[in-house]
Amino acid sequence: MCIRDSLIPPFRLPTDTKWGYQTIHKDGNLPKVERLMNEEMVLPFLEDVEWDLHPGAIASYGDWPVETREEFAYAANARLINIREACQSDKYNGIILLGGGEPGFLEARELCRNFKIVCTANAHSQMYLATMLGNKFSVIDISGVHNVYYRDLIYQHQLN
C-alpha cells in the first residue's frame, strides 16, 4: 500500500506581510519543496512517502500569525474546509496538520475518521513523543496567550 499524505497548514499569510520572516507566507504557486518550512529537517522523513503540501487558506483575520483564541478559531474553520476537500478527494490515507497550536485538530480527527483517514497534528505528536523521552516536558512560546493555549492543549491531550 502506498502512503500518500496531505500536509495542511493552519493558514497562509499574504506574500507581502511584514511577518514573513517567522511564518508561512510563501506564494502558494511555488513547488511544494520550496514552501515546506524546515525542509532540510523534514524531507528525509518524507523520502518514501508520496505527499502534497496544501498552500493553506489566506488568514481571514489579518496579515499576522494567530495571536488570540478568536484567531485560532478562524484558522480552524478555514483549515477544516481544506481537510474536508482532501478527505473527499479520496487521494490520501493520512492528513498531517502543520502548526504548533493545532487549530481544529479534534474536529479534523472526527472528520477524517468518517473517511477512514489517519489525522495527526504537530503539538499532539510532539507532546506524546516528549513523554517517551522523559517524565516531564516544557512548551516554550513567546506569547502569553499562546502559553495558556498550550497549557489547555496539554490538559486536552491528558498529559498533565
Q: Which stretches of residues belong to each language-model region?
A:
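N-terminal glycine-rich anion-binding loop in soluble enzyme alpha/beta folds
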Residues: 4-73, 142-160
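Nucleotide donor/acceptor-binding cores
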Residues: 4-5, 134-137
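Short, well-structured alpha-helical segments in soluble
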Residues: 73-91
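Periplasmic-binding protein-like
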Residues: 92-99
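Short, well-ordered alpha-helical microsegments
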Residues: 102-106, 126-127, 147
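Short amphipathic alpha-helical segments
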Residues: 107-110, 151-152
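Short, acidic/small-residue loops that bind anionic groups at enzyme active sites
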Residues: 109-133
